[in-house]
Amino acid sequence: MGEVAATMKIMPEGVDTDLDDLKIRLEAVLPEGASIFGSEIEPVAFGLKALKLVVLVGDLEGGTEPVEEAFAAVPGVESVQVTELGRPV
């Protein structure tokens, strides 16, 4: 099948969540065969910011679901949403 690039929007539990620390904790729970290709912080509203990650997903069974479930279980994560799927460039 090859690699797929999934852009994921991770919403923190609050405005005081350290997004750099959150990114490190998310990297630590990545399933085998997945890797982070890029990241950025996106302002949402009223001081709240989201962490956007581009995750390369290889031939993982279940596609992006194992990554979404792993990210959602990390303390400090309010929600995980896949916003875009495509081939890495």
Curated annotation (Swiss-Prot):
One of its GO terms (molecular function) is translation elongation factor activity. It comes from the Archaea. Pfam families: EF1_GNE. Keywords: Elongation factor, Protein biosynthesis. The keyword GTP-binding does not apply. SUPFAM superfamilies: eEF-1beta-like (SSF54984). Promotes the exchange of GDP for GTP in EF-1-alpha/GDP, thus allowing the regeneration of EF-1-alpha/GTP that could then be used to form the ternary complex EF-1-alpha/GTP/AAtRNA. Belongs to the EF-1-beta/EF-1-delta family. This is Elongation factor 1-beta.
